[in-house]
Regions:
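Core catalytic region of metal-dependent phosphoesterases/phosphodiesterases
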Residues: 1-70, 144-146, 167, 173-175
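Secondary-structure boundary motif
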Residues: 30, 122-126, 147
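Short beta-strand segments
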Residues: 132-134
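Short catalytic/ligand-binding loop motif for oxyanion handling, primarily in non-cytosolic enzymes
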Residues: 11-13, 44-47, 85-88, 139-140, ...
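Short, low-complexity, polar/charged sequence segments that are solvent-exposed and flexible
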Residues: 21-24, 95-100, 189-193
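Active-site-proximal loop/helix segment associated with metal-binding centers of metalloenzymes
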Residues: 48-130
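Conserved beta-sheet core of the metallophosphoesterase superfamily
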Residues: 2-4, 31-32, 74, 136-205
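Gly/Ser/Thr-rich helix-start
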Residues: 7, 80, 156
Length: 205
């Protein structure tokens, strides 16, 4: 089980920083044996062990180092809140975080997430990749371009949306909303194989 936060989880802590709030949830979730990510990456290695690469590590490592870390990964999950820095209609100015963060901080957090995402895109191709965010891609990415064969899972809008043509996969179709009493789980399929030579160019070695 992998958890991320949404804007509602920030409401009750107006005097705390995002890092403080994140750590409150992280401690509770991880104490109970589950996974939590905020601007971080989880990957399942060839031995089915769950590994995490922290935000500072993602920023520190170059692409070659990250590729080496993920070379034998069967599944990659990158994500976090995402934030709504690129949404001019529904953002911090409309109170979606209440008093916890303002529009300026929201934009900076969006940029922070987008920088990590852009850095990861070329590294995590062909890795059975899930991009797990609360906000949809258009809110946290300047370019609304979905990567081929990535699975994008998000919520926030309270409007269900599903698209899957086996190349582009966007799953925002299990949003509960405010008054839905019919809560259920959904699932999707990912291959569990990995290609250790995916970063090699065609040729003889």
């Amino acid at each position: 089980i992998v958890f991320i936060l949404g804007n509602h989880e920030l409401w009750s802590f107006p005097s705390k920083t995002i890092d403080d709030i994140t750590n409150i949830y992280r401690n509770i979730i991880e104490k109970n044996g589950m996974c939590f990510i905020q601007n971080e990456l989880l990957h399942v290695d060839a031995d089915n062990k769950i590994q995490k690469i922290s935000c500072p590590e993602l920023l520190q490592c170059n692409e070659t180092e990250l590729r080496m870390k993920l070379q034998r990964s069967k599944l990659v999950i990158f994500g976090g809140i995402g934030f709504s820095g690129y949404n001019d209609e529904f953002n911090a100015d409309q109170g979606i975080y209440r008093q916890t963060i303002d529009r300026k901080r929201e934009i900076q957090e969006t940029i922070n997430f987008e920088i990590l995402y852009r850095k990861m895109v070329s590294v995590i191709k062909n890795k059975n990749t899930v991009i797990l965010t609360h906000m949809p891609l258009k809110d946290w990415s300047k370019k609304e371009i979905f990567e081929k064969e990535f699975v994008y899972v998000s919520g926030h809008t309270h409007k269900n949306y599903f698209y899957d043509d086996e190349v582009y996969r966007v799953y925002s179709d299990n949003q509960i909303g405010y008054y839905n009493q019919n809560v259920k789980m959904k699932s999707f399929f990912l291959d569990s194989d990995y290609d250790i030579f995916s970063d090699y160019k065609d040729g003889i070695y």
